[in-house]
């Protein structure tokens, strides 16, 4: 998706169905801060080989507010080995983090990024985004996906038609995020620490770590 956004004249997006059939798709909107995109696939082609009209199946969006220790399930295609389901533990939101992500105690591997994380009811509660190894993985809360989806009209004009429009969209999101970030940093009074005869700034924000 990133390549199609940065160079829409060189790359295209396709969706692959469970039976291996590919359909053209288009990027409708993105959330560059949370590494999300809304993609629309072309309508399923006519009639399946059985002669019955195609019926698409979709996942439902849930919420990311659970008790720590809840079992959840991450889906993806690790190392292009085939669709896999990884069971793990929900360990809440990372509060002392610049971006609120879900801490997932489970093994997310390359190829699983962008896949859904589900609760026992099969509802999407997050999106695979990254891993630190040793079963320390991170999910984007599904609420960010719901917000992005709500911004897309029923019949959108795809921004991907122009690389220039995409760059403008990305720039707007980055600027807005940086403005909020700097405001958080500068608004509160800084705590001072006494070191000998000097006073130095203490913790600016709890999202900054020294390790």
Describe the predicted segments one by one:
Residues 4, 77, 129-130:
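Short, surface-exposed secondary-structure boundary micro-motifs
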Residues 25, 47, 127-195:
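C-terminal cap/linker of serine protease catalytic domains
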Residues 1-34, 41-44:
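Catalytic-histidine neighborhood of serine endopeptidases
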Residues 206-211:
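Secretory pathway targeting signatures of secreted, lumenal, and periplasmic proteins
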Residues 7-10, 20-22, 32-36, 67-69, ...:
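Extracytoplasmic
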Residues 42-58, 81-156:
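Active-site region of chymotrypsin-like
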Residues 26-28, 44-78:
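Active-site substrate-binding loop(s) of clan PA
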């Amino acid at each position: 998706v990133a390549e199609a956004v940065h160079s829409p004249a060189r790359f295209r997006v396709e969706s692959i169905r469970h039976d291996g059939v590919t359909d053209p798709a288009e990027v409708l909107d993105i959330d560059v801060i949370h590494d999300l995109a809304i993609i629309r696939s072309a309508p399923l082609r006519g009639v399946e080989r059985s002669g019955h009209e195609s019926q698409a199946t979709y996942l439902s969006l849930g919420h990311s507010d659970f008790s720590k220790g809840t079992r959840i399930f991450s889906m993806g295609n690790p190392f292009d080995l085939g669709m896999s389901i990884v069971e793990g533990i929900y360990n809440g939101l990372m509060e002392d983090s610049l971006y609120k992500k879900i801490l997932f105690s489970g093994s997310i591997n390359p190829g699983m990024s962008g896949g859904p994380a589900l609760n026992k009811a099969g509802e999407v509660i997050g999106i695979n985004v990254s891993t630190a190894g040793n079963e320390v993985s991170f999910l984007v809360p599904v609420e960010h996906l719901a917000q992005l989806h709500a911004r897309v009209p029923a019949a959108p004009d795809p921004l991907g038609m122009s690389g220039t429009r995409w760059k403008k969209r990305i720039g707007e999101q980055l600027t807005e995020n940086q403005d909020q970030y700097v405001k958080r940093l500068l608004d509160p009074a800084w705590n001072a620490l006494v070191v000998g005869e000097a006073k130095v700034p203490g913790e600016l924000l709890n999202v900054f770590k020294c390790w």
